[in-house]
Design a protein with these regions (language model features):
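Beta-propeller domains
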Residues: 1-411
Length: 411
């Protein structure tokens, strides 16, 4: 009964039942409402022009408002924002009804990442947007706790790259300029305008949160790719980052994303030494994993624990695994939660208990799918007894397609 609020997850659900790529499906929100020990479920499409006019990736090309809105949903300043990284955000209400386009009173005229960060100390929402076709290839934005866009900065990059995620700390933002490079010549042959080109190098850009392009310090790292980050924080003259890092990347259809062990992410730690101008890089575990999360009240601060979804690699194609992982980040020690045989996991979202006494006093929520029975369910796991059976399972009255990211919104 302490768990009261809305769990909502976004994902790709093409109206026709078919899409050329799983990234192109229409955004559908799946909401589970919890109150007084009872649960109810609702699902809704995000009614953007992409949905209303039955558009596809080509017919919506160049229209920032025509968003699939299919990747994430984030709560900030009383608004729920449905996000997809090549488009503007769309606002929905807690009943999952579409409210309309959110361009911050006309101040946002570029795409917005699906992975903004809300600072737990200031309430600010920080985000970026990247462009595949025209300079500036990267823009940075800062939104006040009241929802006003108060800063925008153009950031210089030598070439257009896919920048899916990033990092923040108490005083800095960290951009990841990694070598998935936009090249429209690839689209005809691979179905994706991106290619992995390690010869372009990889680097991390550190900028004060209220800084601009001239303040960015770039630090070279080994070529790699990171779809998602756990967290980052400052410690003396260093910035410590925990990421799901893969040595290489493949970005065609979902089957083509998996090209062997080097294309699967694992937990790594990067330590940026601001005084020496260096970066140390260290793999902490062999477990294949992605979709990392922490307790959101520690975003940009030192978090002891991180949670992620296992990726199954002992099959021909990359598959959502049967386990969730809880990491003690500093040591890399891992605790596994087995969801069940032939159960496909989902992103683990942390929901804190009211007035917690420690960081992991709460629950992990994950929307999972039993492959044989086609039963979807929301599992609720005690984060402090992570390897034990779930404290509750909520059966969803219909199959929920595999999806992406979600949020817990406490009442």
């Amino acid at each position: 009964k302490d768990l009261s609020g809305l769990y909502v997850r976004n994902g790709f659900n093409p109206v026709s039942g078919y899409s050329d790529h799983w990234f192109f499906g229409n955004g559908m929100l799946h909401g589970v409402y919890l109150e007084n020990g009872k649960a109810s479920y609702k699902n809704k499409y995000v009614r953007t022009p992409y949905y209303e006019n039955d558009l596809n990736v080509m017919s919506s090309f160049g229209d920032l408002a025509a968003s699939p809105a299919n990747t994430h949903i984030v709560n900030h300043a009383g608004k729920l924002l449905a996000l997809e990284e090549t488009s503007l955000p769309w606002c929905v209400d807690k009943k999952l009804e579409t409210v309309g386009l959110e361009d911050f009173q006309g101040k946002l005229n570029t795409a917005m990442t699906a992975h903004p960060r809300v600072c737990p100390e200031t309430g600010e929402m920080l985000f970026f947007g990247y462009s595949m076709f025209s300079e500036p290839y990267l823009n940075y934005y800062r939104v006040s706790s009241q929802g006003a866009l108060v800063q925008s900065e153009a950031i210089e990059l030598p070439r257009p790259v896919m920048m899916h995620d990033w990092n923040i700390t108490r005083n800095y933002v960290i951009f990841m300029d990694l070598p998935i490079v936009a090249d429209m010549n690839l689209a005809a042959s691979t179905g994706s305008p991106f290619g992995f080109k390690p010869e372009c190098g990889a680097r991390l850009g550190v900028m004060p949160r209220n800084g601009n392009n001239s303040d960015v310090r770039w630090f070279d790292i080994e070529p790699c790719f990171v779809f998602h980050s756990f967290n980052s924080y400052e410690e003396d003259d260093k910035i410590i980052l925990y990421v799901s890092r893969q040595q290489e990347a493949m970005v065609g259809g979902f089957k083509d994303i998996y090209g062997g062990e080097t294309t699967v992410a694992r937990l790594w730690r990067w330590v940026i030494d601001l005084e020496k101008g260096t970066v140390s890089e260290e793999q902490l575990d062999d477990g294949a994993c992605d979709f990392p999360r922490i307790n959101d009240q520690l975003i940009g601060l030192k978090a002891e624990y991180g949670y992620c979804m296992q990726l199954k690699t002992d099959v021909e194609d990359l598959t959502f695994g049967e386990h969730l992982f809880k990491y003690h980040l500093e040591s890399g020690k891992r605790t596994d939660h087995h969801l069940g045989t032939n159960v496909a996991g989902g992103e683990p979202v942390f929901a804190s208990k009211p007035e917690p006494s420690c960081e992991d006093e709460g629950w992990i929520l994950s929307l999972v799918h039993e492959r044989e029975t086609r039963q979807s369910k929301l599992v609720i796991i005690d984060a402090q007894a992570f390897d034990q059976e779930p404290v509750a399972e909520i059966l969803i009255p219909q199959r929920v397609p595999y999806g992406a990211h979600g949020s817990w919104i406490q009442d």
